[in-house]
């Protein structure tokens, strides 16, 4: 599998405070990299740096090319970002919101040529089960439907890499499973990869292929998901018996 995204000694500082320090990893085709760790570990800040949202030191390369060398429109064709919070204040239809994912592929703002945009939007609506809701106002959607709408938007964008910050945050269990299953289906196509911040360790373990375990802005462990998410490593970072706590919770339901 070929390398798609590479981080080398990435550091992010807010004033005198270092939030991410000397973090390196490589993302290859077909991989789903989970960024896990306690609150304040620097996970969301790291993906903001990858998406171009915050300045950083170090090097980020996309298919061997420095990310800083890409124009914003070029980068948007290659990387799709799903933020943790997606607020809406206008009564756009589901289809209109999903169609915004094609903006990066328009030749210019006024004469927006996008030859396969309609087909991409249709596929995204179908994949996320939103075809029947295409004309509904996004202001009328449930939390799960709204999150699927924004996921469909990045699917319509047709990027090579998805960057996701808590993609199932605040959703019921059934919607969490649905969102992660949709992403898993998207990932099966050639030339794709995913990086996501996930707090739910069970979801990270089930769907991830690889992980970076972060602690206080640094990498505590990285590699294949089963090698990283061990009882010993998780306990060292979370400062508690994570597996024991999970077993106790499940035992209460038995």
Model-derived features with residue positions:
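Conserved ABC transporter NBD signature motif
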Residues: 58-66, 75
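Helix-to-loop junction immediately C-terminal to a conserved catalytic motif
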Residues: 51
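Conserved ABC ATPase signature
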Residues: 137-141, 145
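Conserved ABC ATPase "signature" C-loop
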Residues: 216-217, 223
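Conserved ABC ATPase "signature" region
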Residues: 99, 114-133, 139
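Catalytic Walker B motif of ABC-type/P-loop ATPase nucleotide-binding domains
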Residues: 162-166
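The feature captures the beta-strand-to-loop junction immediately N-terminal to the Walker
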Residues: 36-38
């Amino acid at each position: 599998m070929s390398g798609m995204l590479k981080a080398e000694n990435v550091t992010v500082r807010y004033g005198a405070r270092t939030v991410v320090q000397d973090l390196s990893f490589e993302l290859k085709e077909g991989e789903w990299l989970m960024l896990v760790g306690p609150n304040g570990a620097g996970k969301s800040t790291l993906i903001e740096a990858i998406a171009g949202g915050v300045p950083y030191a170090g090097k980020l390369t996309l298919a061997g090319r420095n990310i800083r060398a890409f124009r914003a429109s070029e980068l948007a064709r290659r990387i799709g970002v799903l933020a943790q919070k997606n607020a809406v204040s206008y009564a756009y239809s589901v289809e209109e919101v999903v169609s915004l994912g094609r903006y990066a592929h328009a030749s210019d703002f006024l004469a927006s040529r996008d030859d396969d945009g309609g087909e991409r939007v249709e596929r995204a609506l179908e994949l996320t089960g939103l075809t029947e809701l295409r004309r509904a106002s996004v202001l009328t959607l449930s939390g799960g439907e709204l999150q699927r709408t924004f996921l469909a938007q990045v699917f319509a964008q047709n990027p090579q890499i998805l960057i996701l910050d808590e993609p199932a945050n605040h959703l019921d269990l059934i919607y969490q499973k649905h969102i992660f299953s949709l992403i898993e289906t998207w990932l099966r196509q050639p030339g794709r990869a995913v990086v996501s911040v996930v707090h739910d360790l069970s979801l990270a373990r089930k769907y991830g292929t690889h992980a970076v375990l972060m602690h206080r802005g640094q990498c505590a462990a990285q590699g294949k998901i089963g090698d990283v998410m061990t009882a010993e490593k998780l306990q060292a970072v979370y400062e508690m018996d994570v597996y024991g706590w999970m077993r106790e919770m499940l035992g209460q339901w038995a």
